[in-house]
Design a protein with these regions (language model features):
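Conserved ATP-binding/catalytic motifs of P-loop helicase motor domains
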Residues: 1-151
């Protein structure tokens, strides 16, 4: 939240998104608790990019609409939480939409989480041209489950 407070202090237009409504709800709670007010209301990444969801058998796929290309026009920064869930198509659309407007995309996620459905790995963590930072200390979870997971 400190990072977003610094972004807000600069006056940059920003928002946060996530692949699922549940994750967006958690983000909204944290932002409200921290007294942060994103320029755009937090939503799913699909909604921000104005994508249409189509179901193909058991998998949902996203398709661009006429508004997708300009979806990030007024945003300087978009924080994308739960980035391990972002599939190749969604990542490609996000990068393509951000490029013309120089919108900064900050992907936050855990490479140890399951990859998107139908993909062997999470493509976000394979971006070659991106800067990376790694958290080494677990802050939110404590107790026996953490001890078991940490070995």
């Amino acid at each position: 939240m400190r990072f977003l407070a610094q972004v807000e202090a600069t006056g940059l237009c920003w928002t946060v998104v996530a692949p699922t409504h549940k994750a967006v709800g958690v983000l909204r709670s944290y932002l409200a608790g921290a007294g942060l007010s994103p320029t755009w209301f937090p939503s799913t990444i699909h909604r921000l990019l104005r994508l249409k969801l189509k179901r193909q058998r058991d998998i949902e796929r996203c398709e661009e609409t006429e508004q997708t290309a300009v979806a990030l026009e007024h945003l300087g920064l978009v924080l994308i939480d739960e980035a391990s869930m972002v599939d190749s198509t969604l990542l490609e659309i996000s990068l393509r939409c951000a490029h013309p407007f120089r919108t900064r995309l900050v992907f936050v996620g855990d490479p140890a989480q399951l990859p998107p459905v139908g993909e062997p790995v999470s493509p976000v963590f394979s971006l070659g041209r991106a800067s990376r930072a790694e958290l080494r200390q677990v802050v939110r979870h404590q107790g026996p489950v953490l001890r078991l997971a940490s070995g």
